[in-house]
Amino acid sequence: MSPPKNCAVCGDKALGYNFNAVTCESCKAFFRRNALAKKQFTCPFNQNCDITVVTRRFCQKCRLRKCLDIGMKSENIMSEEDKLIKRRKIETNRAKRRLMENGTDACDADGGEERDHKAPADSSSSNLDHYSGSQDSQSCGSADSGANGCSGRQASSPGTQVNPLQMTAEKIVDQIVSDPDRASQAINRLMRTQKEAISVMEKVISSQKDALRLVSHLIDYPGDALKIISKFMNSPFNALTVFTKFMSSPTDGVEIISKIVDSPADVVEFMQNLMHSPEDAIDIMNKFMNTPAEALRILNRILSGGGANAAQQTADRKPLLDKEPAVKPAAPAERADTVIQSMLGNSPPISPHDAAVDLQYHSPGVGEQPSTSSSHPLPYIANSPDFDLKTFMQTNYNDEPSLDSDFSINSIESVLSEVIRIEYQAFNSIQQAASRVKEEMSYGTQSTYGGCNSAANNSQPHLQQPICAPSTQQLDRELNEAEQMKLRELRLASEALYDPVDEDLSALMMGDDRIKPDDTRHNPKLLQLINLTAVAIKRLIKMAKKITAFRDMCQEDQVALLKGGCTEMMIMRSVMIYDDDRAAWKVPHTKENMGNIRTDLLKFAEGNIYEEHQKFITTFDEKWRMDENIILIMCAIVLFTSARSRVIHKDVIRLEQNSYYYLLRRYLESVYSGCEARNAFIKLIQKISDVERLNKFIINVYLNVNPSQVEPLLREIFDLKNH
């Protein structure tokens, strides 16, 4: 066993060579950040500091000089271009290695198959004929052969292995779920064309056990869900639309699973409709969200080839709904997007809670609709075929600021439209069940829903019931275990924010000599405040890295989300540490006189950022900004914003953000009463939009400073170039 190594710079424990010298991880990172920087360090002491584990923070100049003296080479530091080339090379080699492993596995598998009893020449030629006869198969085969130079017999073996026509449902699902890291490649091999995709899904859905195994996998890996949809939609835009359409409703997961179990043939039929007429299929889903009967009419028209006439469309709902098979194709339409529910699967808080609610109320609600539809209209304005979410918001939430048509990804309109739909979906069947119980007990009596009175008149209550949940249903508003785990993860991740900042501030003050007295562009105190934000951002980065969903994303997306969202997270977090009495931010410092940073320092910045910040703080209800759970969830919402520049997997990020929107709503419901919780949710969504607006003012402050006077981390985040 080799003796332990010590860092040649500070004496700390070292693992090996870094940039041509034995150093610890701290000195390696310090050298990588500062060796190529144009920033000029100065020693605050005698120009010959003794660098140890303790003192290495206090003098950057002597530490950097010692790094160079022991032989660390700055030319060994990789540029961004070099890093990108290396990353691509690693991915290429990894892909080649997987192809070779798959080819070897295929050859081994072929030895045990019955078809290997045939003559090898016949088998090889038949497989080659199969590839030459299909354009898609040719493209797939050429890619494999280009990356992995197999012989003719080896090339035919993978083709035989991934031929879905010769595989059982169990083997198909095994290939996808056995190795989640390679599931995407398995889907590409199994579904090379639209027809193959339909054949594979038909075979899987016909086996209930294997279908549920696949559903479970897709809930955990939503990217694979989107890939499968795109295989038979043949259009990335339409596939993404279908993928996201059901994600925001917590009740769809239960419906999808139950319909796969009840009527698998209808699910396959619906997927075929998606393939041939995706526009109509999307229309079906939109209608089915709010009006199952309307969805059935559209579905029947498509299934019959568009032959349904106007009389059939306007006929009484009862004959349609009385047909049990007719009910199932619509819900299987949802069911086909079991993959779609993967968004909620990616959000643990959603499916466990709503499974308990919907299994009890939703299925009977759909099944019993025929008995009430003819004599009692659907008791929700949302169930009207003419229902429009945007119009409903403008009429029922007119106390909110006017909504612009050009709204951002986190705007109140874009989120509220999804939230309101979730509300109707979640309470639709519950309130119908409640109304049926009331009618049986007392006809014509006046009922009260959560404090909102409804008259005996049938039309008037229908306009008011969606506003408040029925008080007759005692819903369990406590967070379930999955939701608590997701919230607990945020709490644990935020522990880094509470570490004392003594050492960070000391190191920061040592570097303040870079602020030139003759530079009158900015006040020195404002520059200190700007550099202090680097300490906060470093801690927010540590927090983000402890969130599982963020950690599982590719490095490109992680960098893009942090560069675009760190200041918004900092703004959101700052409202919690703001002291109204002192008009200052409280920081975790052991010395009380160092633990407060006055907000009036913002007055030295250009523009009216101080006034905007005060407006933001004063309009943020104290009971919300003092609730750490709310602030942490909102930090996660602004972090997972798919509109950031240079983001690659926007759909996955949007999926994760929606899960935190849902967690915020559920948490508010567990703390406040029904109407108060919804009002709080709407107001908090508006605050997220306000954060985006305030962030633009703050970014302008960073862009107007001299890059040589700010921390390297800030230069990297805001792409500041040294003058």
Swiss-Prot record:
Compositional bias (Polar residues) spans? 122-142, 151-163
Cite the InterPro entries for this sequence: NHR-like_dom_sf, Nucl_hrmn_rcpt_lig-bd, Nuclear_hormone_rcpt_NR1, Znf_hrmn_rcpt, Znf_NHR/GATA
Tagged with keyword Protein biosynthesis: no
Q: Which residue ranges does the record annotate as region Disordered?
A: 95-163
Query: Annotated Gene Ontology MF terms?
Result: nuclear receptor activity; RNA polymerase II cis-regulatory region sequence-specific DNA binding; RNA polymerase II transcription regulatory region sequence-specific DNA binding; zinc ion binding
Q: What induces it?
A: By 20-hydroxyecdysone (20HE) 106 hours after egg laying.
CDD domains from the entry? NR_DBD_CAR, NR_LBD_F1
Residue ranges of DNA binding: 4-79
The lineage's top-level taxon is Eukaryota
**Residue pairs linked by disulfide bridges in the UniProt entry:** none
- Zinc finger residue extent: NR C4-type: 7-27, 43-67
Metal-binding recorded as keyword? yes
A Pfam family cross-referenced in the UniProt record is Hormone_recep
* GO BP: any one term: negative regulation of transcription by RNA polymerase II
Instruction: Give the protein's biological function.
Output: Binds selectively to the HSP27 20E response element.
Q: Which protein family is it in?
A: Belongs to the nuclear hormone receptor family. NR1 subfamily.
* Protein name in the entry: Nuclear hormone receptor HR96
Q: Which organism is it from?
A: Drosophila melanogaster (Fruit fly)
Q: What is the lineage of its organism?
A: Eukaryota, Metazoa, Ecdysozoa, Arthropoda, Hexapoda
Gene coding for it: Hr96
